[in-house]
Each structure stands twice: as C-alpha cells, then as structure tokens.
Amino acid sequence: MNGMEARLRRIIRKETGRSLVVAIDHGMALGPMTGIVDLKTTVTELDATNTIDAWLITKGMYTHAFEPAGKPGIIMRASGAATIAGPDLTHEGITSSVEEALRLGADAVAASAFIGSAFEHQTLVDTAMMATACHQWNVPLLGVMGLGKNNEEKAKDPKFIALGARVGAEHGADIIKTYYTETDFDKVVAGCPVPVMIAGGPKCETDLDTLNMIHGALQNGARGIVMGRNVWQSPHPAALLAAVEALIHRNFNVREAAQLLESRIHG
C-alpha cells in the first residue's frame, strides 16, 4: 500500500467502496447559513452519529470550529475566494496548498472547476496544477465540478454532467463530485475512470426526496455523496444520516431507509 491508497481509505470505506462525506465548506462563499451558523455545534451533533466517513471543510473552519470526537477523514478545500457579494461565484482561485493541508492533518484536497463558465479555463488549469502538486505527495484530489449561473439548467443534463466528470478526471482528479442527473447517470459514471460522488445541489423539499436521490445515484454507479445542505438543513439531520448511511453502506432500499429514518425520529 502506498500513501495514496492509505489516504483514500480514510475517505472511501474499503468494505463497500463507497463514502458518506458531509460538506461544510459553504460558508466560504455564502456566509453563515441555517444549519452551520454555529459550525462547532453542528459538527459535534453530526459526528456523534458515527455515520460520517469524511468531512469537506475549509482551512479556517478546520482550525477554529472543528472538534469531532471521532476520527473521520478530512478533505481540505484548496480553492475559493469568490462570494455571493461578488460578480461571479465561478471566479475561484487557489487558496491553499497540499503542504498546508498535510500540516493541518488532511487526508485529501478539493478544488473546483466550472465547466462552461467564463472561468472554465482558469479553474481547470488550477485543478490540473493542484492534481500535480497532490500527486507529488500521494494526496487524493477531489474535483468539484461546478456549473455557474449560465449553466444551472444543465445540472440534469447527462451529457453535460458526463463532460464535466470526464474532464475533471482528465485533469487529474482522483474523485469527482458532481450532480445527479436522474436519467442516464450510469453513462456519467461509465465515462469517468475515477469514483463519482454526488452533490446535494439545492435543498430537497423533503428528506424522502433526499433518500430517493441518493438511492437512484447509487443504483447507477455513484460511489457515495459529498452533501451539505440536504443533511444539516434537514429537520432531523442525525436521523437522516442514519438512513443515508444505510443506503450507502448497507444497501438498504428507499422504503427500508425511510422506515429507519422514521424510527430514529420517533424512537
């Protein structure tokens, strides 16, 4: 086993080949949000479920507001510097280094690229160069394949999402985070040689919608989730995590997961 394999095992469970990653990096662009205003409390409550394989977090929050009792994997955000107050959320740049991530104790690094946006070229260059730096240290890179405002309607377009997933892998990402397309997602997975994990995207209306989305993705080859709002903005995030973990690692169907969710809520 080399360093890359060892670190990937901190993110993806060896037994199932899947992963449940909770993303808590939203504040870097969106500021305080319902569910992560008090990030330290949220982390403590969700960590207590013992369901989370890894967290996606920024270096600032990792340093100042992250105290899990367990030992989950850590994926450190290495791109950002664009907010909702600015002209374009896709105008990200590199904000950290592999060396800094390793000093902080991270197991992997994440960088965004925005396919079809005005900043496609620069964010892909940044992703490729970050991949080069990561691989010098045997550190996995999570490629976060974003869209941008002009392409939001393409979040369900299998051809467009497949393009992004493949391009991310071509530029060196070891894991891809992208959107679930509902149709032909198996083709997205088939065209990408590295594990594909789904983002939550906009908040689902109900927890059952979240379970259906995750189950559909898993059935079509997704290797898990990298999800934020649909977890920590749920009315019952701890109960939902138990149900999601059962979908991902115990092959529950939606009915079984929904029953587990209800039992955790009312039990």
Feature locations, PLM:
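N-terminal basic/disordered segments at the start of proteins
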Residues: 1-14
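Extended terminal accessory/targeting regions
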Residues: 265-266
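Histidine/acidic-residue-rich catalytic or RNA/ligand-binding cores of hydrolases
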Residues: 210, 235-244
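A short, acidic, flexible beta-alpha connecting loop/helix-capping segment that sits on the rim
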Residues: 229-233, 262
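Alpha/beta enzyme core
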Residues: 14, 19-198, 204-227, 245-246, ...
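Alpha-helix capping and helix-loop boundary segments enriched in small/acidic/polar residues
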Residues: 155, 232-235
